[in-house]
From Swiss-Prot:
The active site is at 69 (proton acceptor). Changing residue 27 to N: In strain: Port-Louis. Gene3D superfamilies: Janus/Ocnus. PANTHER family: BCDNA.GH02250-RELATED (PTHR12258:SF5), JANUS-A/JANUS-B (PTHR12258). This is Sex-regulated protein janus-B. JanA and janB regulate somatic sex differentiation. The keyword rRNA-binding does not apply. Substrate binds at residues 42, 110-112. GO terms for cellular component: cytosol. One of its GO terms (biological process) is cell differentiation. InterPro entries: Janus, Janus_sf. The keyword Ion transport does not apply.
Length: 140
C-alpha cells in the first residue's frame, strides 16, 4: 500500500520537469538565431529566455532596414511574446550584408540600446549555415 502511495507522487514530481524541459525549451530552440536582410541594416544582439522556466537563455541576432533600433525590438516582441519568450537587448549596431560578394561588415553602436559585442555577433553569424562561408569583419 505504501508503494502505491509513493507511486502516486511520481506525476507531481515529473510534471514540472517535463513542462520545463519540453514545451518551453522546444519553443526557445525553435527561434532562428539569425534574421538579417541584404544591404546596410541596423541590428540587435538579443538574449532570449522563457521566463521562470529556463535558467539560461539563447543569444540571437536580428537586423532590418529600419529608421531606428526600437523598430527592430518591436518586431522581436511581436515574434516572441505569443510563444511566452522574454527578450533582453544586449546592444546594437550596424551590419553591411553583401551576399553576392559573401562579405559582412559589423560596426557601429545603437543610440537607444548601446553597443553590442560585435565579436559575439560575428561568432553567431559564422555558426549559422547561411553565413559560414562569408568573410565577416568587425570594426569596433
Amino acid at each position: 500500500m505504501k508503494m502505491f502511495k509513493s507511486l502516486s507522487l511520481i506525476p507531481r514530481i515529473v510534471s514540472p520537469f517535463q513542462k520545463c524541459y519540453s514545451t518551453d525549451l522546444i519553443s526557445l530552440v525553435g527561434v532562428p538565431r539569425v534574421k538579417i536582410t541584404k544591404g546596410q541594416n541596423r541590428y540587435l544582439l538579443v538574449n532570449i529566455h522563457t521566463h521562470g522556466f529556463t535558467k539560461y537563455g539563447r543569444v540571437i541576432v536580428r537586423g532590418a532596414d529600419v529608421d531606428n533600433h526600437l523598430a527592430i525590438f518591436d518586431s522581436i516582441l511581436e515574434e516572441l511574446e505569443p510563444e511566452g519568450i522574454c527578450a533582453k537587448i544586449l546592444g546594437g549596431g550596424r551590419i553591411l550584408n553583401e551576399p553576392d560578394n559573401k562579405k559582412i561588415k559589423i560596426y557601429g553602436t545603437s543610440r537607444t540600446f548601446g553597443g553590442a559585442d560585435h565579436t559575439r555577433t560575428r561568432n553567431i553569424l559564422q555558426a549559422w549555415t547561411t553565413y559560414k562561408d562569408f568573410k565577416i569583419t568587425v570594426k569596433q
